[in-house]
């Protein structure tokens, strides 16, 4: 089953089973974080305009269920960008990727970041294939073009409508027929050959040519389109499909990092790292009854580490407060050994 949260921020909940012989382990608490907004870095290639992407992510066209804070830079600024500050990164027609930039992007994805790639006219295939190799993915072999002006190089053939990307996008068809996507006209298409690793083709064209490919690497994910985000390669950006597909792609990618709060067992301890918190800041832990506990804390590079241990922590949900603001929610679970009635 699935549940859609109706608010943002740090949320707490529980899953409960029917009563049985031992009642105290029939519920399992959890916490999750639904961000107020998702920070997106849009990196435009030299001479590439991100107008269609900006328009597609504008508040006037996108749903209110998620808010995107878009920061736009040219590809020359990629090496100086701190990727970890963003929930997803878009490479829009980027031409070249240095070895340092490839290493930074790979580390970002492996650490849980989301990457969206649109090809471009002048992209250096060796640079992008180097990045794809680092991510354990396949290879770009070239660009296909139609044999005549205005002739499409292919049409949508197979669509994985069961993918999370399309959740709730199509109405149920009682006849069992597969929903059909609007068919854009493709003038040019990037040719991509998948590897045998953790990747899947979400949308393919006739001839089994990937149009939208997902690549999993480490804790993160990459979505790669077969066309650029303008109207030179296709008319996709002026089709009704473009905005929901772009929106859902970034929503999906920006959620690839873990959104669950930390947890520990009763009687154990935990070192909780809070990034970006000044060393002199007082951290407070508050339980469900409103009682507060001030843990020992120490300053490390770029963060504060709080030592959570002691008799204060019994099964339940706890708020972590910095200057009276909830910055984290954690769960203390009962020891599983307590559920073993044979002991």
Stretch-by-stretch model annotation:
Residues 1-343:
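N-linked glycosylation sequons
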């Amino acid at each position: 089953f699935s549940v859609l949260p109706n608010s943002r921020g740090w949320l707490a909940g529980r899953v409960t089973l029917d009563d049985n012989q031992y009642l105290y382990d029939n519920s399992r608490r959890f916490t999750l974080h639904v961000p107020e907004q998702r920070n997106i870095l849009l990196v435009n290639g030299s001479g590439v305009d991100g107008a269609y992407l900006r328009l597609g992510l504008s508040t006037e066209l996108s749903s209110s269920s998620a808010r995107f804070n878009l920061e736009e830079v040219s590809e020359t600024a990629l090496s100086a960008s701190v990727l970890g500050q963003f929930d997803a990164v878009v490479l829009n027609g980027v031409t070249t990727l240095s070895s340092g930039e490839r290493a930074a992007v790979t580390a970002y994805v492996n650490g849980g970041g989301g990457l969206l790639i649109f090809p471009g006219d002048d992209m250096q295939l060796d640079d992008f294939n180097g990045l794809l190799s680092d991510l354990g993915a396949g290879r770009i072999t070239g660009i296909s073009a139609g044999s005549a002006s205005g002739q499409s190089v292919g049409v949508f053939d197979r669509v994985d409508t069961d993918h999370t990307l399309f959740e709730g996008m199509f109405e149920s068809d009682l006849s069992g027929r597969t929903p059909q996507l609007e068919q854009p006209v493709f003038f040019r298409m990037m040719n991509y050959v998948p590897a045998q690793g953790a990747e899947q083709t979400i949308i393919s064209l006739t001839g089994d040519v990937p149009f939208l490919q997902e690549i999993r690497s480490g804790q993160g994910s990459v979505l790669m389109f077969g066309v650029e985000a303008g109207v030179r390669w296709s008319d996709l950006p002026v089709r009704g499909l473009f905005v929901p597909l772009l929106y859902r792609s970034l929503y999906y990618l920006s959620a690839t990092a873990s959104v669950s709060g930390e947890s520990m067992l009763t009687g154990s301890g935990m070192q909780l790292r809070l990034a970006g918190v000044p060393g002199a800041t007082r951290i407070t832990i508050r339980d469900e009854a409103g009682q507060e506990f001030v843990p020992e804390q120490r300053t490390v590079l770029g963060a504060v580490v709080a030592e959570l241990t002691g008799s204060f922590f019994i099964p339940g949900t706890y708020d972590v407060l910095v200057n009276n603001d909830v910055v984290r929610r954690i769960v203390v679970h009962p020891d599983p050994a307590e559920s073993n009635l044979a002991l």
